[in-house]
């Protein structure tokens, strides 16, 4: 497990990826995968616009990770994501074999921001609840209130 300062640094890397996602015409979400030595080994943008609504950054990253790395390796990896994974993304991270997930802002907070926007109809199903239904543990850390303003700045004007 990394320190709070390291977690924040990796979350900031995910924020940079979310900015790239917006620049590419997609939704403002991004994530990175960090191995147990603290190296970023993958990053993923959202590609909602080009992947039929299922191209969430976290699910994309989990699928890439499952193809590129062995499951034992992935148990030592942590996904850092700007916003708490939805139930689809949490399930994908679980099945990929990731060991931990760290998020900056809760899905509930995102829902407050997006309201009933048709491209982001959030569900009230925290990732901790999804992971707790599994047969193996996935460590979850978040939210990081000290990064909320920085994360939500990327969303400014996007959902209106």
Give short role names for the model-derived ranges.
Residues 50-60:
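A short, polar/charged loop-to-alpha-helix boundary motif
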Residues 1-21, 92-160:
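Zinc-dependent deaminase
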Residues 41-48:
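Short beta->alpha transition motifs characteristic of CBS
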Residues 48, 81, 105:
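Residues that line or immediately flank small-molecule/substrate-binding pockets and catalytic motifs
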Residues 24-28:
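Short, flexible loop/turn motifs enriched in small residues
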Residues 63-96, 100:
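Helix-adjacent hinge/juxtasegments
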């Amino acid at each position: 497990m990394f320190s709070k300062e390291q977690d924040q640094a990796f979350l900031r890397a995910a924020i940079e990826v979310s900015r790239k996602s917006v620049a590419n015409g997609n939704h403002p979400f991004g994530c990175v995968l960090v191995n147990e030595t603290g190296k970023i080994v993958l990053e993923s943008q959202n590609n909602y616009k080009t992947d039929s609504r299922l191209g969430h950054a976290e699910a994309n990253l989990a699928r890439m990770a499952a193809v590129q790395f062995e499951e034992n390796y992935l148990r030592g990896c942590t996904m850092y994501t700007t916003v708490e994974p939805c139930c689809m993304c949490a399930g994908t991270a679980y099945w990929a074999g990731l060991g931990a997930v760290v998020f900056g802002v809760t899905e509930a907070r995102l829902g407050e921001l997006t309201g009933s926007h048709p491209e982001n109809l959030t569900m009230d199903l925290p990732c901790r609840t999804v992971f707790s239904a599994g047969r193996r543990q996935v460590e979850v850390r978040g939210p990081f209130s000290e990064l909320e303003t920085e994360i939500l700045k990327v969303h400014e004007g996007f959902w209106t």
